[in-house]
Amino acid sequence: KVFEKCELSQMLKANGLDGFQGITLEEWICIAFHESGFDSRALNYYNGSSSHGLFQINRQYWCDGQDAKSTEPSVNACQISCDKLRDDDIEDDIKCVKKILKESQGITAWEAWQPFCIADLDQWKC
């Protein structure tokens, strides 16, 4: 599903992501746009691993699934199938995002954040 900006904003807010670990809703909307174009089914390959869903969560560390381009086992820290990160239900994606924020390198885990989502966030407001 490709979400509309404000539809996604409402869902992220309803699931407690606004202000979580100090990250604003506008930053999350910006990240989702630059990572996946708001597409919950996005699948990309980079550096021999796959990234999944709205937030492009990486298989190597966070989810479990077969990856044709990598034989390395997944850590599966979010205890979720990568396929579940590419469906229309993003509540489980948000739980994984929160885990990444708390247990990993925080918001810098998302490469889109620093170059695109620190300043001038007005376009991401609803």
Swiss-Prot record:
Domain of life of the native organism: Eukaryota
One annotated GO molecular function is: metal ion binding
Indicate the segments forming the C-type lysozyme domain, all copies: 1-126
Expression tissues? Mammary gland specific. Secreted in milk.
Which cysteine pairs are covalently linked by disulfides here? C6-C126, C30-C117, C63-C82, C78-C96
Keywords on record: Calcium, Disulfide bond, Glycoprotein, Lactose biosynthesis, Metal-binding, Milk protein, Secreted
Record-level GO cellular component terms: extracellular region
- GO terms (BP aspect): defense response to Gram-negative bacterium; defense response to Gram-positive bacterium; lactose biosynthetic process
Q: How does it assemble?
A: Lactose synthase (LS) is a heterodimer of a catalytic component, beta1,4-galactosyltransferase (beta4Gal-T1) and a regulatory component, alpha-lactalbumin (LA).
State what this protein does: Regulatory subunit of lactose synthase, changes the substrate specificity of galactosyltransferase in the mammary gland making glucose a good acceptor substrate for this enzyme. This enables LS to synthesize lactose, the major carbohydrate component of milk. In other tissues, galactosyltransferase transfers galactose onto the N-acetylglucosamine of the oligosaccharide chains in glycoproteins.
Protein name (record)? Alpha-lactalbumin
The protein's organism comes out as: Tachyglossus aculeatus aculeatus
Q: Which gene encodes it?
A: LALBA
